[in-house]
A protein has these predicted regions:
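Structural beta->alpha junctions
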Residues: 33-38, 149-152, 185-192, 203, ...
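Peri-transmembrane interface segments
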Residues: 193, 198-225
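Extracytoplasmic
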Residues: 22-24, 46, 78-81, 106-108, ...
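The feature marks short, hydrophobic/small-residue-biased sequence motifs that occur predominantly
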Residues: 45-54, 58, 62-112, 137-139, ...
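Alpha-helical transmembrane segments
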Residues: 1-27
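Solvent-exposed, non-transmembrane alpha-helical starts
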Residues: 37-42, 73, 77-80, 91-95, ...
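Mid-to-C-terminal secondary-structure elements
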Residues: 90-97, 115-165, 169-172, 195
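Short extracytoplasmic
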Residues: 30-49
Length: 225
């Protein structure tokens, strides 16, 4: 029974890091004040740019993350949805078909909806697949669903939404333009993520923390333990 409980618990922790595992990154920058994906603080985007001074760093991607109110287009009830904003030309997820979908976010007001989100968000997948125009409000502003992704709910999020940083900042204007919640770093082939993270943690100011992807996954799991 104890082993069954442990297995069940591990399964729950795994659902809390679904997005973390899908991120296309070797290193992840976060604010030292961030506690988990449900409690993220911002840090200066320029810290991410500064990592490019290191030869091992191949490319970076700034990401914003917060909870915004989604309006169910069927019953008009609102519910918090985890919203990620990134530059559509950057690589965000380890998903072959994702970049094609991300391309559609270059037009403002467009979003990708996680079809594994809880049903309380509305029949979004059904409407979208029947080629019905799926338009609703996020944070009181109109958005159009341009595609579906497959991420899945977690401890902290009943549903997920992906959009461009441009649209994100329009939906959440209180977010300073030069501030991000997550910085993704891809290293050149052959680089040692642990070694590079140690170098960056020593060289960057203490308003940012550099984790390997595995450490970022553990950071989230530890919050829920």
């Amino acid at each position: 029974l104890m082993f069954m409980q442990l297995g069940f618990r591990d399964g729950l922790f795994d659902t809390s890091v679904t997005i973390h595992k899908l991120l296309d990154a070797d290193l992840v920058l976060i604010s030292p004040r961030s506690k988990s994906s449900i409690s993220m603080s911002g840090f200066p985007k320029r810290r991410l740019i500064q990592t490019l001074a290191l030869e091992d760093v191949e490319k970076t991607a700034p990401v914003n993350l917060t909870y915004l109110l989604w309006r169910n287009p069927e019953n008009l009830k609102t519910r918090s949805i985890l919203t990620l904003g990134f530059n559509p030309s950057d690589s965000l997820l380890l998903d072959d078909g994702f970049s094609r979908k991300a391309d559609k976010l270059k037009n403002p007001g467009r979003v990708l909806f996680d079809k594994l989100s809880r049903p309380e968000f509305g029949p979004i997948e059904d409407w979208f697949l029947s080629e019905k125009k799926v338009e609703t409000e996020v944070a009181g502003k109109r958005v159009l669903v341009e595609g579906l992704v497959e991420l899945g709910p977690s401890f902290g999020a009943d549903g997920n939404l992906i959009t461009s940083r441009e649209t994100y900042l329009r939906l959440f204007p209180a977010n300073p333009k030069g501030s991000i919640e997550i910085g993704l770093v891809k290293l050149r082939s052959g680089s040692n993520p642990i070694l590079v993270s140690e170098i960056l943690n020593k060289s960057l100011p203490n308003d940012v923390r550099v984790l390997t992807k595995d450490q970022f996954i553990e950071f989230e799991k530890n919050y829920w333990k």
